[in-house]
Amino acid sequence: MRPSPPRFGWLLLPLLLAGCGTVKSPTEPPPEGPGTGTAFTFAQIQREIFTPTCAKAGCHDAASASEGLVLEAGVSYGLLVGHPSSEHGSLNRVEPGSPERSYLILKLRGDPSITGQRMPLDGPPYLTPEQIEGIAAWIRAGAPND
Protein backbone atom coordinates (compact mmCIF):
# COMPACT_ATOMS: atom_id res chain seq x y z
CA MET A 1 0.00 0.00 0.00
CA ARG A 2 1.31 3.42 -1.03
CA PRO A 3 1.57 6.12 1.68
CA SER A 4 -0.66 9.11 1.02
CA PRO A 5 0.82 12.63 0.92
CA PRO A 6 0.02 14.92 3.82
CA ARG A 7 -3.29 16.66 3.29
CA PHE A 8 -2.01 20.06 4.26
CA GLY A 9 1.34 19.88 2.46
CA TRP A 10 0.09 22.19 -0.29
CA LEU A 11 -0.24 24.94 2.33
CA LEU A 12 3.55 24.93 2.73
CA LEU A 13 4.20 25.44 -1.00
CA PRO A 14 3.65 29.25 -1.02
CA LEU A 15 5.95 29.62 1.99
CA LEU A 16 8.69 27.62 0.30
CA LEU A 17 8.38 29.62 -2.93
CA ALA A 18 8.40 32.93 -1.06
CA GLY A 19 11.83 32.05 0.29
CA CYS A 20 13.32 31.70 -3.21
CA GLY A 21 15.27 34.71 -4.45
CA THR A 22 15.65 38.08 -2.85
CA VAL A 23 13.57 41.18 -3.16
CA LYS A 24 15.39 44.51 -3.11
CA SER A 25 13.95 47.25 -1.03
CA PRO A 26 12.70 50.19 -3.12
CA THR A 27 14.70 52.49 -0.83
CA GLU A 28 17.97 50.67 -1.52
CA PRO A 29 20.35 53.04 -3.34
CA PRO A 30 21.36 52.10 -6.90
CA PRO A 31 24.85 50.71 -7.41
CA GLU A 32 27.58 53.19 -8.31
CA GLY A 33 30.97 52.97 -9.89
CA PRO A 34 32.59 51.76 -13.06
CA GLY A 35 30.21 49.80 -15.21
CA THR A 36 27.04 51.38 -13.86
CA GLY A 37 26.90 54.60 -15.91
CA THR A 38 26.88 56.84 -12.83
CA ALA A 39 29.58 59.29 -11.80
CA PHE A 40 32.23 57.84 -9.57
CA THR A 41 35.35 59.02 -7.86
CA PHE A 42 38.78 59.42 -9.38
CA ALA A 43 40.03 56.80 -6.91
CA GLN A 44 37.54 54.30 -8.36
CA ILE A 45 38.55 55.16 -11.93
CA GLN A 46 42.20 54.68 -11.00
CA ARG A 47 41.67 51.42 -9.12
CA GLU A 48 39.16 49.77 -11.44
CA ILE A 49 40.04 51.13 -14.89
CA PHE A 50 43.42 52.87 -15.22
CA THR A 51 45.55 50.53 -13.09
CA PRO A 52 44.35 47.19 -14.53
CA THR A 53 43.67 48.37 -18.09
CA CYS A 54 46.04 51.22 -18.96
CA ALA A 55 49.05 51.35 -16.61
CA LYS A 56 50.67 48.25 -18.10
CA ALA A 57 54.13 47.63 -19.53
CA GLY A 58 54.39 49.12 -22.99
CA CYS A 59 51.40 51.39 -22.49
CA HIS A 60 50.93 54.06 -19.81
CA ASP A 61 53.20 52.79 -17.03
CA ALA A 62 56.12 54.94 -15.82
CA ALA A 63 58.68 53.06 -17.93
CA SER A 64 56.75 53.43 -21.19
CA ALA A 65 54.77 56.65 -20.70
CA SER A 66 53.19 56.46 -24.14
CA GLU A 67 52.56 60.02 -25.44
CA GLY A 68 54.00 61.30 -22.14
CA LEU A 69 51.03 59.95 -20.21
CA VAL A 70 51.51 57.81 -17.10
CA LEU A 71 48.30 56.37 -15.69
CA GLU A 72 49.77 54.90 -12.52
CA ALA A 73 48.31 55.79 -9.13
CA GLY A 74 49.79 58.93 -7.63
CA VAL A 75 50.74 60.61 -10.91
CA SER A 76 47.86 60.08 -13.32
CA TYR A 77 45.59 62.88 -12.06
CA GLY A 78 48.21 65.60 -12.61
CA LEU A 79 48.96 64.33 -16.11
CA LEU A 80 45.28 64.21 -17.09
CA VAL A 81 43.28 67.09 -15.64
CA GLY A 82 43.95 70.42 -17.32
CA HIS A 83 46.95 68.93 -19.13
CA PRO A 84 47.18 69.47 -22.92
CA SER A 85 46.90 66.40 -25.12
CA SER A 86 50.13 65.60 -26.95
CA GLU A 87 48.11 64.32 -29.92
CA HIS A 88 45.53 67.10 -30.19
CA GLY A 89 47.04 70.33 -28.88
CA SER A 90 43.77 72.28 -28.86
CA LEU A 91 42.25 69.89 -26.30
CA ASN A 92 43.19 69.00 -22.75
CA ARG A 93 43.35 65.35 -21.85
CA VAL A 94 40.62 66.10 -19.30
CA GLU A 95 38.77 69.41 -19.39
CA PRO A 96 36.88 69.69 -16.06
CA GLY A 97 33.16 70.13 -16.66
CA SER A 98 33.40 69.30 -20.36
CA PRO A 99 33.68 65.65 -21.40
CA GLU A 100 33.04 66.57 -25.05
CA ARG A 101 36.21 68.74 -24.94
CA SER A 102 38.25 66.05 -23.13
CA TYR A 103 40.60 64.10 -25.37
CA LEU A 104 40.48 61.14 -22.98
CA ILE A 105 36.78 60.61 -23.72
CA LEU A 106 37.34 60.96 -27.47
CA LYS A 107 40.10 58.30 -27.32
CA LEU A 108 37.96 55.94 -25.24
CA ARG A 109 35.02 56.31 -27.64
CA GLY A 110 37.17 55.98 -30.76
CA ASP A 111 35.96 59.33 -32.08
CA PRO A 112 36.90 59.96 -35.74
CA SER A 113 38.71 63.19 -34.75
CA ILE A 114 41.41 61.38 -32.72
CA THR A 115 44.98 60.81 -33.79
CA GLY A 116 46.08 57.20 -33.56
CA GLN A 117 43.90 54.40 -32.30
CA ARG A 118 41.03 53.98 -29.90
CA MET A 119 42.04 53.17 -26.34
CA PRO A 120 42.69 50.84 -24.70
CA LEU A 121 45.06 49.77 -27.44
CA ASP A 122 44.65 46.05 -26.77
CA GLY A 123 40.86 46.25 -27.32
CA PRO A 124 38.42 44.98 -28.21
CA PRO A 125 37.06 44.56 -25.74
CA TYR A 126 37.16 48.26 -25.05
CA LEU A 127 35.63 49.92 -22.01
CA THR A 128 31.88 49.45 -21.84
CA PRO A 129 29.61 52.38 -22.72
CA GLU A 130 28.67 52.50 -19.03
CA GLN A 131 32.30 52.79 -17.96
CA ILE A 132 32.95 55.56 -20.49
CA GLU A 133 29.80 57.40 -19.40
CA GLY A 134 30.91 57.02 -15.76
CA ILE A 135 34.22 58.71 -16.60
CA ALA A 136 32.35 61.38 -18.59
CA ALA A 137 30.04 61.98 -15.60
CA TRP A 138 33.11 62.41 -13.36
CA ILE A 139 34.50 64.98 -15.83
CA ARG A 140 31.09 66.69 -16.07
CA ALA A 141 31.13 66.98 -12.25
CA GLY A 142 34.39 68.96 -12.47
CA ALA A 143 36.88 66.03 -12.43
CA PRO A 144 37.53 66.22 -8.68
CA ASN A 145 40.59 64.48 -7.24
CA ASP A 146 38.63 62.34 -4.84
Residue ranges of model-derived segments:
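Bacterial N-terminal signal peptides that target proteins for export
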Residues: 1-11
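C-terminal motif of bacterial Sec signal peptides marking the signal peptidase cleavage site
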Residues: 17-19
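Solvent-exposed helix-loop boundary motif
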Residues: 21-38, 43-47, 51-129, 133
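Flexible coil segments in periplasmic/lumen-exposed cytochrome c-class electron-transfer proteins
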Residues: 129, 141-146
